Amino acid sequence: YFNLIAKHINVQEDLDIVFMKWDQDIPKTKNKCILFVTSDEHHKYHEKFTNHPNVILTFRNYLPEQHHPKVKALPLGYLQGFEHEDINFNDRKYDYSFSGTLPDAPCDATRHALKFSLERLDTLEQQYEKFVLFYEGWAKGLTMPEYADVMYNSRVALCPKGYTSSETFRYFEAARAGCVIISEPKPDVWFYKDAPHIEIKDWLKLPSVLPSILKDKDLLNHHHELTKKWWEEKCSPESVGAYITRELNKLKFRFRYEGYE
């Protein structure tokens, strides 16, 4: 995902692009650089990204609450291997799906509330085609090709927040697959503006919410189209590369205006 973004950054100056995890040291670079920083799910503020003389801008996942003009939000995107041919929305096998970990209680009440609600849905008279898998331990569930197949075959994707952050890769993978997304509120950052998900604040209410969504074909198709549009305009590698280009050009203009060039 990040390599594809980098291909769509269009600036005239020599500029190095560094991919790194938040806890790594910033490497020496020949030219001024921008950073792509990942993996800090605690949204912490790190001065090294704002004080380093060679760093022009930092684009990072999990934007901290403490804002800084040199630090910009970056979508999580999708994990390597999440690839699948597109499947017509009305031809998909599953009405809804979820595949993810289930930690020991009470570590994550959200995930247990989701599991309880999905079990309640199984008792309803109306039965749905679904794929639901809870498992213990990181990377103990589906392979990435299997997971992509489930997501691209789902009309509705249930996307609860991550354990330490309200953000999750699942949300963006569901968006890339054109699913109707049900999720909690998201942070106030640029790419979540006009995000197309159907908001839920309490997963225990899912049994009363999901059936009405699945019955409304017009609503499903509308949100499917909104999701595809949002992905293409806000989170696809092409659109994120264009966003980074705009931010770099704004910075270049400001430097010239203030007499730094």
Tell what function each PLM region has.
Residues 197-204, 213-217:
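Conserved acidic donor-binding segment of nucleotide-sugar-dependent glycosyltransferases
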Residues 118-121, 207, 217:
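Generic N-terminal initiation segments characterized by hydrophobic and/or small/turn-forming residues
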Residues 200, 206, 227, 257-261:
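Hydrophobic transmembrane alpha-helix bundles
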Residues 205-212, 222, 226, 239-247:
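Alpha-helical elements of Rossmann-like donor-binding domains used by nucleotide-donor carbohydrate transfer enzymes
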Residues 179, 217-218:
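Residue-level recognition of short, well-ordered coil/turn positions
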Residues 1-199, 233-259:
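Nucleotide-sugar donor-binding catalytic core of glycosyltransferases
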Residues 212-213, 233:
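Long, intrinsically disordered, low-complexity Ser/Thr/Pro-rich regulatory/activation regions
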Residues 219-233:
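A short, well-ordered alpha-helix in the C-terminal region of glycosyltransferases
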